[in-house]
């Protein structure tokens, strides 16, 4: 049930990062932080599974920012379930689709996507 806000974005760190919260205020809440380093866009994902994938933006288009995994910390084994791909698609001025791909036992295991519209309500 996504009738209530389940995804939020906020600019932080003096305008140097964007914080994304997924499943806001739920037990499975996750946080991602987007930031630039030397002109390159990175994303650190703090997963409800307890691991932390670090990703870098791959070549982008006007409509999409794909990310590829650089590393994943806090996994007991490289076979653990973790997020292994991510993209943000810009569907319009007030709508995005966020896609997540997962890997378990070093094989793709599906994923999820969410299309959300901006709510200007403070």
Model-identified regions with their sequence ranges:
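Hydrophobic small-molecule pocket/channel-lining residues, especially in calycin-type beta-barrels
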Residues: 1-122
């Amino acid at each position: 049930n996504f009738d209530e806000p389940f995804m939020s974005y906020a600019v932080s760190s003096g305008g140097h990062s964007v914080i994304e919260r997924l499943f806001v205020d739920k037990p499975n809440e996750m946080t991602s932080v987007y930031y630039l380093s030397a002109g390159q866009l990175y994303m650190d994902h703090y997963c409800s599974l307890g691991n932390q994938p670090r990703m870098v933006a791959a070549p982008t288009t006007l409509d999409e920012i794909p990310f590829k995994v650089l590393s994943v910390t806090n996994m007991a084994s490289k076979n653990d379930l973790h997020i292994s791909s991510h993209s943000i698609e810009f569907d319009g001025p007030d709508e995005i689709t966020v896609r997540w791909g997962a890997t378990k036992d070093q094989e793709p295991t599906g994923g999820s996507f969410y299309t959300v519209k901006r709510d200007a309500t403070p």
